[in-house]
């Protein structure tokens, strides 16, 4: 529905939650892309220790993700979860500067566990809860979720360049900016009125909201061969790629005259890539509708394999910049392809549980195991040799997935 056709309250909610997405993903971008750089340069962690931190974050994401999904479904349009995450984000700078960093330098395991709890709650688990809540608000207030979500891409892209510049001056500046923007999130939550209309409540009562996780549907999935075929792809391709990307920033900045210059360029490339990602995301549903979800996942796997293997042979800054930009082509095919594959290859009632177990939890569980091992490999054989091994793994599993993923001759609507 057009913005002009919305009621005043609905129009206000559209604006409030568009801004909420912008500032939330701005804050997330202050953490995620440059986190391995912060661990290495500020806290002097080895690549093995960095892998341990990532493993802990994934571990606590596994613990909290299902819990927050259930709580989110129970709360509906009430703002309790968003208030909790906003308060925790206000503490972003104090936590990183006065708690997380000293703990990491004093005891790596204590720091990894405490940081894993905080980051696993605020970002790895809660980002899904934020997305689900605002999607629910969009249905209750008759505006399109996708139009609101684009502002998150813009916030992420803008912060990447700012952080790349400020990191060379003082990383703490970015953390304080993030905490300040979290205060704005609080104001936006305070003024928003996301209560649904009567008709929306009826739709909600009829089960239009996403199905909650249940052990019965999980057990039904485990008996399906096509479920395990999908798991093979997620664990062998998508999960390995995520672990590869965790410390790519440290590899990237090594190709420049100084680490500071490398960090700045990494920020600019991330910004350009994120804007390109948003553009491709608009086109991806129509493309995937034409080629099919299985082929979309295979193309994503091929792009991931090319990027990892290409990185193992990269010798110049230009090459790593081009390889970094490939990430923005892979993401739309992976995300949209996953949703379309789930909807075409499985029963509708299984889709939510399948996405939770088959995609999110399996990726996080794989990351718990792989992150520390890959970090250790970086320290022992170096980035190039490790990337060659990881690239061969993803390429092999992409080929295997050609036979284990289920194809579908039925084309889906061109909406993600």
UniProtKB/Swiss-Prot annotation:
Its chief place of residence is membrane
Q: Where is this site: Proton translocation?
A: 307, 327, 330
Q: Which GO terms describe its molecular function?
A: lactose binding; lactose:proton symporter activity
Instruction: Give the transmembrane ranges.
Output: 14-34, 51-71, 81-101, 103-123, 150-170, 171-191, 224-244, 268-288, 296-316, 317-337, 354-374, 385-405
Membrane topology per the entry is: Multi-pass membrane protein
Catalyses: lactose(in) + H(+)(in) = lactose(out) + H(+)(out)
Q: Which InterPro entries match?
A: LacY/RafB_perm_fam, LacY/RafB_perm_fam_CS, MFS_dom, MFS_trans_sf
Q: Which Pfam families match?
A: LacY_symp
The site (Substrate binding) lies at: 131, 149
Residues the record marks as site: Substrate binding and proton translocation:
274
Residue ranges in the Cytoplasmic topological domain are 1-13, 72-80, 124-149, 192-223, 289-295, 338-353, 406-416
> Mind listing the UniProt keywords for this protein, alphabetically?
Cell inner membrane, Cell membrane, Membrane, Sugar transport, Symport, Transmembrane, Transmembrane helix, Transport
Q: Which domain of life is it from?
A: Bacteria
- Report the subcellular localization: Cell inner membrane
**Is Iron found in the keyword set?**
no
Identify the residue ranges that face the Periplasmic compartment according to the record.
Answer: 35-50, 102, 245-267, 375-384
**A cellular component term, taken from the record's GO annotations:** plasma membrane
Q: Does the keyword Transmembrane apply?
A: yes
Family per record: Belongs to the major facilitator superfamily. Oligosaccharide:H(+) symporter (OHS) (TC 2.A.1.5) family.
Purpose of the protein = Responsible for transport of beta-galactosides into the cell, with the concomitant import of a proton (symport system).
Query: What PANTHER family does the record tag this protein with?
Result: 3-PHENYLPROPIONIC ACID TRANSPORTER-RELATED, BLL5896 PROTEIN
What is this protein's name? Answer: Lactose permease
Q: Which gene is annotated as encoding this protein in its UniProt record?
A: lacY
């Amino acid at each position: 529905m057009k913005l002009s056709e919305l009621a005043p309250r609905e129009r206000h909610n559209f604006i409030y939650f568009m801004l909420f997405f912008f500032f939330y993903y701005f804050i997330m971008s202050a953490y995620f892309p440059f986190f391995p750089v912060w661990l290495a340069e500020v806290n002097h962690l080895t690549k093995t220790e960095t892998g341990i931190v990532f493993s802990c974050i994934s571990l606590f994401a596994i613990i909290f993700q299902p819990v927050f999904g259930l709580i989110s479904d129970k709360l509906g349009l009430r703002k309790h979860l968003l208030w909790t995450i906003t308060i925790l984000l206000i503490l972003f700078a104090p936590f990183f500067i006065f708690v997380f960093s000293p703990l990491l330098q004093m005891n790596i395991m204590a720091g990894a566990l405490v940081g894993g709890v905080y980051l696993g709650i605020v970002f790895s688990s809660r980002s899904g809860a934020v997305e689900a809540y605002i999607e629910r608000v969009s249905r209750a207030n008759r505006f399109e979720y996708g139009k609101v979500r684009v502002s998150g891409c813009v916030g992420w892209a803008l912060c990447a360049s700012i952080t790349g510049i400020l990191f060379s001056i003082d990383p703490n500046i970015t953390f304080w900016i993030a905490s300040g923007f979290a205060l704005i999130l609080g104001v936006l939550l305070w003024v928003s009125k996301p209560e649904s209309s009567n008709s929306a409540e009826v739709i909600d009562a009829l089960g239009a909201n996403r199905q909650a996780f249940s052990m019965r549907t999980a057990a039904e999935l485990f008996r399906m061969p096509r479920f395990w075929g999908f798991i093979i792809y997620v664990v062998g391709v998508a999960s390995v790629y995520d672990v590869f990307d965790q410390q790519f920033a440290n590899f990237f900045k090594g190709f420049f005259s100084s680490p500071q210059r490398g960090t700045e360029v990494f920020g600019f490339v991330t910004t350009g890539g994120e804007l390109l990602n948003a553009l491709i995301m608009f086109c991806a549903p129509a493309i995937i509708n034409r080629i099919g979800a299985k082929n979309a996942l295979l193309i994503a796997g091929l792009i991931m394999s090319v990027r990892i293997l290409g990185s193992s042979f990269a010798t110049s800054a230009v090459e790593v910049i081009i390889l970094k930009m490939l990430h923005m082509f892979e993401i739309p095919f992976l995300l949209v392809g996953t949703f379309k594959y789930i909807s075409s290859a499985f029963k509708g009632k299984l889709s939510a549980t399948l996405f939770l177990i088959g995609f999110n939890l399996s990726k996080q569980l794989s990351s718990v195991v792989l992150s520390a091992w890959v970090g250790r490999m970086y320290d022992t054989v170096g980035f190039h040799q490790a990337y060659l091994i990881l690239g061969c793994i993803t390429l092999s599993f992409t080929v295997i997935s050609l036979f284990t993923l289920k194809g579908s001759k039925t084309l889906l609507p061109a909406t993600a």
